Structures are given as C-alpha cells and as structure tokens.
Amino acid sequence: MGDITRFGISIDSDLLDSFDRLITRKGYQNRSEAIRDLIRATIVEEKMDAGHEEMVGTVTMVYNHHVRDLADKLTEHQHQHHHQVISALHVHLDAHNCLEVLVLKGSSAEIKQIADELLGVKGVKHGKLFLTSATPEHH
C-alpha cells in the first residue's frame, strides 16, 4: 500500500447510521476499511462497464446432465474459448443434476459474451456470472 491520505467527508446522520450498521453486519473493523472496499468495488464496476479491461470471472451453472447432448455442448463451448477458460470444476449434485463452475480471464466484454452463450444453452437450469478485476488494487 502506498502513502495513506486522510480526508473528511460530510454525510447525513441517517445515512451514516445505516452505514455503521452495514459495517457492523459485515464485520469491518472501522469505516476506513469499508470505504476503501466501496471505492475498489466502484472501480471494478467501472472497468467492467468499459468492456476492454482485463477481468477474471466465474460462471456458475446448474444443469441436468441427462438432457440430450447438453454436457457435450457445454464442453465444446469451453474448448472454443480455451484461451479464456482457465479452469473448470464439475460437481455431481445428485443422480441428475450437475454444478459447473468455470473460471475465465479476458476482457469483460469477452467474458460476458461467453457467459451469456453458456447460460443460454438449452437445458441449463440457471446460472450466474461474477466478474472482478484481474488487476490487483492497493489495499
């Protein structure tokens, strides 16, 4: 971490009370830690919106592996994007359903496109994309 700069802010007391409750609920030691995390999260969102920053993400999906050709389609899709798909975890939830978590790296636009394509495959019950910055921020 670089030099620490102290600064003050003006804030409505009701908003501050809500923020303090959030800090307590999330287990922060102090307001500064919480504010730093909020700033980092906002910077990551800005990078995601830009579309060209390098990001990492996970695509988590649940599907019934008995659906005809579904597992093959998902695997083929991963191979088509082998430069972006850097890891995969496959879990058998029960006799019919599987959970798959893919780790992807690339621009936010690329990752979003791959996730949309995977989650749009017929037979995928549900899924979610989580993106974050691949560039470490100072803590």
UniProtKB/Swiss-Prot annotation:
Cofactor binding notes: Binds 1 nickel ion per subunit.
Domain of life of the source: Bacteria
One of the record's GO molecular function terms: DNA-binding transcription factor activity
Residues the entry annotates as binding Ni(2+): 79, 90, 92, 98
One GO BP: response to nickel cation
Coiled-coil parts of chain: none
Keywords: DNA-binding, Metal-binding, Nickel, Transcription, Transcription regulation
InterPro entries the UniProt entry points to: Acetolactate_synth/TF_NikR_C, ACT-like_dom_sf, Arc_rbn_hlx_hlx, CopG, CopG/NikR_regulator, Ni_resp_reg_NikR, Ribbon_hlx_hlx, TF_NikR_Ni-bd_C
Gene3D superfamilies the UniProt entry points to: ACT-like. Chain A, domain 2, Met repressor-like
Required co-factors: Ni(2+)
PANTHER family: NICKEL-RESPONSIVE REGULATOR
Family: Belongs to the transcriptional regulatory CopG/NikR family.
Protein purpose: Transcriptional regulator.
Name the record gives this protein: Putative nickel-responsive regulator
Native organism taxonomy: Bacteria, Pseudomonadati, Thermodesulfobacteriota, Desulfuromonadia, Geobacterales
